Amino acid sequence: APARGENTDIPGIVVAFAERGVTELRGTAQVLGAGETAASAAIAAQRLGAECVEVYARRPERARALAERLGADVTAHALADWRVGREVALVVDTVPRGYSPEEHLLGDLGDTALLSAAYDPWPTPLAERWLAAEAPVVTGLDMLLHQAVYQVRLFGGAPIDEPVPNEPAVLERMRAALA
C-alpha cells in the first residue's frame, strides 16, 4: 500500500487558538519563519479565515519558496520588514527561540492573537509583549498538546477527526504532564 501521512500540526494549531477564543479571523495573518511549522501555521490561518497570509523570513528566498508552495493569498517578505498593523488579526512566531524585534515595531496590539511556537525559553520576547498587552497568546506547548491529541487518535487507528474514548480526560492528563 502507498505511504500515507497526516499533518497534526494544522488541527493542533487551530484547536489551540480556539481554546483562547480565536475561532475565526478577519484580516491578515503574519507568520514569522519559513520552515515546516510556519507552513502548517499558514495553512491553519487560512482555515481560520485569514484574508491573506504574510510570511516573513530572515532569508526572503525561503519566504518566497513557502509562499509559492502554499499558493494564493500568501505573500513573502524579509523578516527585517515585519511590523504589526491594524489589519493584522494573528501573528505566528516560528523563529527558533522566538523573534525579538525593536519595541516600536509592535504598536498597539489590540486583539491581535499570537502563537509563539518556541517553548524554551518561555516566555519569548514577543510573548512577553503580548502578555503585557493582555492580548491572546497561544504557547508552543499549547500547540504541541493539541497536536499530540490528534496523534493519539491516529496511533489508536482512528480517523484524525474522530475523538478517542474519554478524550477530555486524556487531554487533561497530558496537560498535567506538561505542568
Predicted regions and their residues:
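Glycine/small-residue-rich loop that forms an oxyanion/phosphate-binding "nest" at active or ligand-binding sites
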Residues: 1-27
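Rossmann-like adenosine-cofactor binding region
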Residues: 71-138
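Adenosine-phosphate binding glycine-rich loop
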Residues: 117-179
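NAD(P)-binding Rossmann-fold cofactor-contacting core
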Residues: 48-70
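Short, conserved loop/helix-junction motifs that constitute active-site signature segments
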Residues: 24-25, 47-49, 105-112
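N-terminal Rossmann-fold NAD(P) dinucleotide-binding loop
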Residues: 38-39, 123
